[in-house]
Amino acid sequence: NVPETAYAANMSDISVTSTREDVQQVVDDGNFDYTELDGTEIDHIYELYNNDPETIKQLQRQSDYNATGDIATLSARYTHSSMFDGYKVIKGIDVSEWNGDNINWKKVKAAGISYAFIRVGGRYYGSGKYFIDSTYKDNIKNALNAGVDVGVYFYSQAISTSEAKTEAKYTTDLISGYNITYPVVMDYEYAWEDGGLSGRLYNAHLSKSAATHVIKAFCAAVESKGYVGMIYASKTVITDDMNASSIAQSYPIWNAQYNDTDTLTVKHSYWQYSDVGKV
């Protein structure tokens, strides 16, 4: 008998004729690197994953974890901003269909998770059309049944106040009838394409003032429906691309900063310290 030789899929196995299974194998083997893809290959991968605008980001996250095993856990120690000295830290997670359709929410609750932000949908970064997260209804229902408080987020690509208001209405319509007690979040981030930042939001190059008006329009529209509006963005975007201090006067901010120390100095209420984790 000839022994089988272990085979690891790599980036050379990805082309414009690859199947979703081909791409996923490269990810599972920890060898996915979006910087090695050309524009047509990236477009093909987006199509394989139903044009979800978070595809490249999520595949890279999964691959990086599979390659290193570096993952955030509740037991790790993280240093919060000194502005929270004396505060009680409450732990939560954020999920989408990228986390699968069989989350055991009772185990999530038992692991010490008090709340979850659940993706309900978003806007495609190219066409500007909306999409719905296929797992949001079950995630909301099952999280609530397990005693996990729920907030939601919408992947935004709004470039005007009118678009922001429309996104807010779309989001609140989707969650009507559910007991949403945590914020309704505008996920304000740039898309990845051709090895760099892209998409209608990034390409609009909004001024800090214009971006601030867009964000406030979303939050105000959400607030008018009885929810708390909130903005999610990376520390860099919060610092460089919006008037965060002005936003913080009226609405909470969720800081995405992936390290063991929260260094954002502007007032904020939530800190996402990792983009991969388990409970």
Each predicted region: which residue ranges?
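Active-site-proximal loop/turn and secondary-structure-junction residues that shape catalytic pockets
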Residues: 97-99, 122-124, 156-158, 190-192, ...
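Functionally critical loop-and-helix segments that line ligand-binding/catalytic clefts
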Residues: 14-105, 246-279
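Surface-exposed substrate-engagement region within the catalytic domains
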Residues: 17, 169, 174-184, 188-279
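N-terminal carbohydrate-binding/catalytic regions of secreted carbohydrate-active enzymes
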Residues: 67-151
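Glycine-rich anion/phosphate-binding loops
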Residues: 132-135, 158-172
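Second-shell loop/turn segments in exported
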Residues: 94, 125-130, 154-161, 200-209
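Sec-dependent signal peptide cleavage junction
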Residues: 1-14
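Structured segments of extracytoplasmic/periplasmic soluble domains
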Residues: 26, 48, 96, 107, ...
